[in-house]
C-alpha cells in the first residue's frame, strides 16, 4: 500500500507543477480536467502526510522514553500517535479503493407504481416526495421529465433528474423494489395492505459519452396530459423516443417545447444505453455476481416502510429506524451512510 501512496504523491506533485505553469489555462477543458484530478488526489495526499507524521511522532517518543523524567509524557505521546496511525491506515485503505467514475454525476430517477393498484401509485408519489425533499436538503435541484399522475394524486410513473455534485454517489443504492405496509387511504375497513413501487437510479450521461446513431431513433410527438387524461396544453409538445436496436422507449412532457422535451429524452436515452453497456460488461467480468450491497437488482426487495409500526427497514444491511415520518420527509442520510459503509467494507474484502 505504501508504494501506491507514494505513486499518488508523485502524481499529485506533478499536477501541482503543471497547474503553476503560465500556459496552464490555454486549454480550459484540459485545465479543468487536471484540476479535478488534483482535487481528487488531495485528500489522499493529506491523509498520507498525517500518517507519516504520526509514524515520526512514534519514533521520536520511543527515542526519548529512556529519559525517566520524560517517560510518562512520551508514553502518552506514543499511544496517541499509534492510535492516530491506525485510524489513518484504515482511512487510507478506503481512500485508495477504486472510485466509481460516475459518482460525481447527476442522477436520473425513475419511479413506477408496482403491485397494489392505486395504493402503489400513492406510495410511488410518497417516494417521489421523499427524494425531492432529500435533494432540497442537499441544495440540489429536481428537474421533472415525465410525471403520470392518477386521479387520486398517486403516480403511475415519475421520471426526473436530480442535479447536484455527487448525487449519484449518494442515491445509487436506491435502485430496487420498495415495499410499503399501511392502511390505504382508499380502504374503509382499516386493514393493512402491502404494496410496492420500483425505483431505478442511473447516472446522467451526456450524448457525447454514448454514441447514438440518429437513424436508430424514432421520434413520436403527442399532447402533454395531466391526471385523468386532461390536456395541459393544446400543442403536441410531448416527445417519445424509441431506440429501435434496443427497444428502449423514453418520454418527456414537462417542458413547453418539443425541442426541450427532445433534449431531455436524449439525456435519458444516453443514460439507459450506458447502463445496458455497463451491465453487459459487468456480467462478462463477474459472471453476473452481485455484491450484497451495491446499486441493487431492480427486482430485489431492498426496503420496507411499515407505517403502523413507524418502522423503516433496509434489508441489505439489516438497519431498522423507528422514525418513518422523518424518513418520508427526506431524512435518509443515516440509511445511505450505512449502505455506503457496507459497500466500502465489501470492496475492501474483495481488494485484499
Model-found features: residue ranges?
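Charged, heptad-repeat coiled-coil alpha-helices that serve as long linker/dimerization "arms"
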Residues: 1-107, 345-352
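Ribosome-associated translation termination/rescue signal centered on the conserved GGQ peptidyl-tRNA hydrolysis loop
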Residues: 87-352
Amino acid at each position: 500500500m505504501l508504494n501506491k501512496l507514494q505513486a499518488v504523491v508523485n502524481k499529485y506533485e506533478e499536477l501541482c507543477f503543471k497547474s503553476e505553469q503560465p500556459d496552464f489555462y490555454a486549454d480550459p477543458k484540459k485545465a479543468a480536467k487536471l484540476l479535478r484530478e488534483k482535487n481528487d488526489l488531495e485528500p489522499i495526499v493529506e491523509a498520507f502526510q498525517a500518517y507519516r507524521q504520526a509514524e515520526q511522532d512514534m519514533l521520536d517518543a520511543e527515542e526519548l522514553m529512556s529519559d525517566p523524567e520524560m517517560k510518562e509524557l512520551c508514553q502518552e505521546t506514543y499511544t496517541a500517535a499509534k492510535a492516530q496511525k491506525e485510524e489513518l491506515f484504515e482511512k487510507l485503505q478506503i481512500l485508495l479503493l477504486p472510485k466509481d467514475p460516475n459518482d460525481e454525476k447527476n442522477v436520473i430517477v425513475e419511479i413506477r407504481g408496482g403491485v397494489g393498484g392505486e395504493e402503489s401509485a400513492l406510495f410511488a408519489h410518497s417516494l417521489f416526495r421523499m427524494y425531492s425533499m432529500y435533494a432540497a436538503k442537499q441544495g440540489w435541484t429536481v428537474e421533472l421529465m415525465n410525471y403520470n399522475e392518477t386521479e387520486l394524486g398517486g403516480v403511475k410513473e415519475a421520471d426526473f433528474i436530480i442535479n447536484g455534485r455527487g448525487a449519484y454517489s449518494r442515491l445509487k443504492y436506491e435502485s430496487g423494489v420498495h415495499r410499503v405496509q399501511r392502511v390505504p387511504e382508499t380502504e374503509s375497513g382499516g386493514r393493512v395492505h402491502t404494496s410496492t413501487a420500483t425505483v431505478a437510479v442511473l447516472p446522467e450521461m451526456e450524448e457525447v459519452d454514448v454514441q447514438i446513431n440518429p437513424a436508430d431513433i424514432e421520434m413520436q410527438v403527442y399532447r402533454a396530459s395531466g391526471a385523468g387524461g386532461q390536456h395541459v396544453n393544446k400543442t403536441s409538445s410531448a416527445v417519445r423516443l424509441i431506440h429501435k436496436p434496443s427497444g428502449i422507449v423514453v418520454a418527456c412532457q414537462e417542458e413547453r417545447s418539443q425541442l426541450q422535451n427532445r433534449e431531455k429524452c436524449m439525456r435519458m436515452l444516453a443514460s439507459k444505453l450506458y447502463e445496458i453497456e455497463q451491465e453487459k460488461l459487468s456480467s462478462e467480468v463477474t459472471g453476473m455476481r452481485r455484491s450484497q450491497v451495491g446499486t441493487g437488482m431492480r427486482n430485489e426487495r431492498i426496503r420496507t416502510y411499515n407505517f403502523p409500526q413507524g418502522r423503516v427497514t433496509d434489508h441489505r444491511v439489516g438497519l431498522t429506524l423507528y422514525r418513518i415520518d422523518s424518513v418520508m420527509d427526506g431524512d435518509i442520510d443515516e440509511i445511505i451512510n450505512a449502505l455506503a459503509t457496507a459497500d466500502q467494507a465489501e470492496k475492501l474484502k474483495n481488494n485484499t
